[in-house]
Amino acid sequence: MPVRIPSTLPAVEELKKENIFVIEEQRASSQDIRPLRIAVLNLMPLKLMTETDLLRLISNTPLQIELDLVLPEGHEWTNTPKEHLEEFYKSFNDIKKNNYDGFIVTGAPVEMQDFETVDYWPQLQEIFDWSRTHVTSTIHICWAALAGLYHHYGIRKHVLAEKLSGVFEHRVLEKSNPLFRGFDDVFYVPHSRHSEVRKEDILKVPDLSIVSESAESGVYIIMARNGREIYITGHSEYSPLTLDCEYHRDLSRGMNPHVPTHYYIDDNPAKGPLVRWRSHANLLFSNWLNYFVYQETPYDIRDIK
């Protein structure tokens, strides 16, 4: 949260140069506080796990949050109890008249398909368009990032020769960006995907900015519309054992997967994972909630446009 200090204090300018968030008294006195309304469009197969992963991160701030879990209609979800979906989820039609301060669209296990062949693609296109007029800031994760970039900007995804799985070293390209306040020079992020977007394609679109990348796993975070759209190709939200579960799942299916890169201690699955991304995952989501949601959203949620 910001430090509230007098605007004439000499430290103000120095703190701003260091990318420390300060809020001057005049602005602080005019701020109203209400619970933030966040919606999650959960397209992952193991919905309970994804709910827990995301809630672990978005609850780690002083901000009060009201959450709606959302699904597209017309798709049969086979890996989550129907009773759970009926009790805790809403359809897009249930919420499309609402405005939200923040919106998270998760990944989905459909990377090998063309976007147009995904059965809920037409509705997802409607949701992407809706988010531009009903949400202050939207995070798109993994497949959702590829889908959003394709829908809004025509950027095509490219299927990888083999699955990218592991925990990779990343760097910030835009150090003054509030999304990275408190980040180390090098930080780690899990990736688990079969497709990618390419840097050269993104650089052709003036409205897009690559703000973080990895020498091994490629483009990580792309931003548009001053942070109203954030595209994240990795899985910072993953729990310590998620990549391990995916690896053993693929083994049991006879898929002969590679051991996730830089994930296990000494690259040995028997020794378990070395968790190196937890603190930066928390920073990423708390910075998003503070600087791109709380600080930008209108007090009257009906004023979001």
Outline where the language-model segments fall.
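Cysteine-nucleophile active-site neighborhood
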Residues: V105-E174
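Short, glycine/charged-enriched secondary-structure capping and boundary segments
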Residues: D53-L55, E83-H84, T117-Y120, Y153-R156, ...
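Helical hinge/lid and interdomain linker segments adjacent to catalytic or ligand-binding clefts
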Residues: L85, Y89-N93, F115
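N-terminal beta-loop-helix "entrance" segment that forms/cooperates
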Residues: E73-E86
